[in-house]
């Protein structure tokens, strides 16, 4: 499968899952984006069109993180989970954004679950 087909497949899955799982204030959407070297995660309220929280491996507090990409992803998941629990959010809808539930995406989800998020 070539690069163009992979991108088209991911876009198709992304739009299908976005239509299915809408985030609200009580149960926001945990949206993951993964680039080759970084990982980004946001809590999105689709009803009001607002970003409630966001954490990435590029943010100032995470600039000096050492370890493998999976270890960093697990740390990012724990951080978003802890911040969400502090705001009173415990239930979320997990949006893997068309990426396979494997590797860094799975590590981020495991870290968020360890911090207390339910999905």
Swiss-Prot record:
Subunit structure, interactors included: Part of the 50S ribosomal subunit; part of the 5S rRNA/L5/L18/L25 subcomplex. Contacts the 5S and 23S rRNAs.
Region of interest called Disordered, as start-end residue ranges on this chain: 1-22
UniProt-listed Pfam families: Ribosomal_L18p
SUPFAM superfamilies: Translational machinery components
HAMAP family associated with the record: Ribosomal_uL18_B (MF_01337_B)
GO MF term (any one): structural constituent of ribosome
Protein name: Large ribosomal subunit protein uL18
Biased composition (Basic residues): 8-19
Single GO cellular component term: cytosolic large ribosomal subunit
Keyword Endoplasmic reticulum in annotation: no
Protein purpose: This is one of the proteins that bind and probably mediate the attachment of the 5S RNA into the large ribosomal subunit, where it forms part of the central protuberance.
NCBIfam families, A to Z: L18_bact
Keywords: Ribonucleoprotein, Ribosomal protein, RNA-binding, rRNA-binding
Family: Belongs to the universal ribosomal protein uL18 family.
GO biological process: translation
């Amino acid at each position: 499968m070539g690069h163009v087909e992979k991108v088209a497949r991911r876009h198709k899955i992304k739009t299908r899952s976005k239509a299915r799982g809408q985030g609200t204030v009580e149960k926001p959407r945990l949206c993951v984006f993964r680039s080759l070297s970084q990982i980004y995660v946001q809590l999105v309220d689709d009803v009001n069109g607002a970003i409630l929280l966001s954490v990435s491996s590029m943010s100032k507090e995470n600039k000096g993180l050492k370890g493998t990409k999976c270890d960093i992803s697990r740390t990012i998941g724990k951080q978003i989970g802890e911040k969400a629990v502090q705001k009173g959010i415990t239930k979320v809808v997990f949006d893997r954004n068309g990426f396979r539930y494997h590797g860094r995406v799975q590590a981020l989800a495991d870290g968020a679950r360890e911090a207390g998020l339910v999905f």
